[in-house]
Amino acid sequence: MAFKHQLILSTAILLAVLAAASASFREQCVPGREITYESLNARREYAVRQTCGYYLSAERQKRRCCDELSKVPELCWCEVLRILMDRRVTKEGVVKGSLLQDMSRCKKLTREFIAGIVGRE
């Protein structure tokens, strides 16, 4: 009986630790904190340049994108790409849709490019 209570207590503690870690992760990868607005725009321009042929030279965009990404904790990189592809958050915290919404004719290609970056097919 004591073993059963100890197991339940251990499980409860483990779940509490996991919940706290999950909340901490979500709070850390928030635009305006660890993810800067400048870094989101640098990645947007690079992704669009790679797939649509717009903006500055590819090498300059790649360098800017990588420089900005290096300032963000690695655990936030996937969140950065998700924000880039799925929504845009202004400095005021307003969600404005996708950062690539204005590039609708290239959106499918850009999504495929971003998926390749994170290792998905």
From Swiss-Prot:
The keyword Secreted applies. Residues 1-24 form the signal peptide. It is found in: Secreted. GO terms for molecular function: serine-type endopeptidase inhibitor activity. Its main location: secreted. Keywords: Protease inhibitor, Secreted, Serine protease inhibitor, Signal. Gene3D superfamilies: Plant lipid-transfer and hydrophobic proteins. The keyword Secreted applies. It comes from the Eukaryota. InterPro entries: Bifun_inhib/LTP/seed_sf, Bifunc_inhib/LTP/seed_store. GO terms for cellular component: extracellular region. PANTHER family: TRYPSIN/FACTOR XIIA INHIBITOR-RELATED, TRYPSIN_ALPHA-AMYLASE INHIBITOR CMX1_CMX3. Belongs to the protease inhibitor I6 (cereal trypsin/alpha-amylase inhibitor) family. This is Trypsin/alpha-amylase inhibitor CMX1/CMX3. It comes from Triticum aestivum (Wheat).
